[in-house]
Amino acid sequence: LAFIITMSCIDFTNSSMDVYDQYHANNTHGSLYSFYINVRKMMLSKPKGYKEEDVQALLSNADSEEQTTVDKEEMPNIIAIMNESFSDLNVVGDLQTSEDYMPFIHSMTKNTIKGQLLVSPFGGYTCNTEFEFLTGLSMGVLPRGSVPYLQYVSKQYPFSLPSHLDELGYKSVAVHPYLGRCWNRQKIYELMGFDEFISFDNIKKYMDEDDIEYVRYYVSDRTSFKLVTDQLENKKPGEKMFLFNVTMQNHGGYTYDGGEFPTVTISNLQGHYKEAEQYLSLIKESDKAFEELVRYLKNYDEPTIVVMFGDHQPAVEQEFYEELYGKSLSKLSTEELQQRYKIPFVIWANYDIESQDDLKTSPNYLSDLLLDTANVPKNEIENFTSEVRNDVPQINAMGHYDSDGNWVSRDEDTSNALDKYEAVEYYMLTRKENKDEKENKDDKK
């Protein structure tokens, strides 16, 4: 029964457990069968030559790196938004539309860092991108087809972003306006060190029912962001907050016929792709909501930094993607396929930061980049991933781009940096809880 309940919350829309080509594995075998045939491959195996003391020394060296000492008063509030299915499909191929579906984000330049994430999932498995961001660990060195939230995170994880920020005096609140049981978030967020979890299950404690806005079937981004800003409004004086928001507005599928929002239309493709157009219309709604959030934060009287990023591209019509590519998906090389795994991100602050554009990275490095930008001290994992990022700036479950921008398939990888990463990740996910961690977990109950 527990398995059935868990699986009922998984967004299986045109996705599967095969990280090389999730869409085709699903169509060939079906989602449940794809899950079944990969289960045997998902167990963590000790890396070749692994020694726990070597990993501990590696992390100790990373932790000892000199960092700027920052007064708590100078540290900003931190908002991280993982926006459901948020992507710019123009990365796949030339896409022309009746209007800009991301006008505000495209216009942002001041105090703004924009770029591209290389993610592992397509059309689903949101939790894997989320896992990478919150832990600094990578799907690229885990067994193919892994779902860490369901397999590997079963004890207190003191190296997560919320746990680290808790040590720095932050209050950490997760906001996800959907069922808390999905992807086991109710349990995972507790183990990750969040102090509070606002989900659809308890949303009426935080907001009047009449104030909850829906777009199609899901809580809107505007409402989701309002739950975030309400936390800022109601926090204690001097309290620093980390707010992690996983949105729902743009979740698939894209066949809603209520007509409650204007439609962005595609103008340069031969086919008529209603799902893709509905999706693009939703992205424009997200862009509007983000503009409202930034406007609010501009007038907020405490330094605050926000990052927004997507989890995966949407599973809209296969024919749409094939026309963008100019060829059948079955004819794509693994490197060509990576265009379906590239997602935008934006970092903005209501104070001066150095602006950048077209920065290429991955979700596992994004929290490190965020803390660097915010001038917040980092832990040993974040320092370690900073070093790996120099050699492997982008990584996903299929391979990585090296420092020269060359694609390296996972089966062809010989990177010493990734060997170390795999050892660190194995250690982090298999280590035993110490006494302090067990006591901390008990205190959070």
Language-model-detected regions and their locations in the chain:
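Helix-hairpin-helix/helix-loop-helix acidic hairpins
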Residues: 30-73
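Membrane-interface micro-motifs in multi-pass membrane enzymes
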Residues: 22-34, 123-124, 219
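General structural feature for long, well-ordered alpha-helical segments within catalytic domains
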Residues: 12-19, 31, 35-38, 224, ...
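Transmembrane and membrane-interface helices of multi-pass
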Residues: 1-25
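Generic intrinsically disordered, low-complexity segments enriched for polar/acidic and small residues
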Residues: 9, 17-20, 30-33, 47, ...
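Solvent-exposed soluble domains appended to multi-pass membrane proteins
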Residues: 60-76, 80-83, 88-445
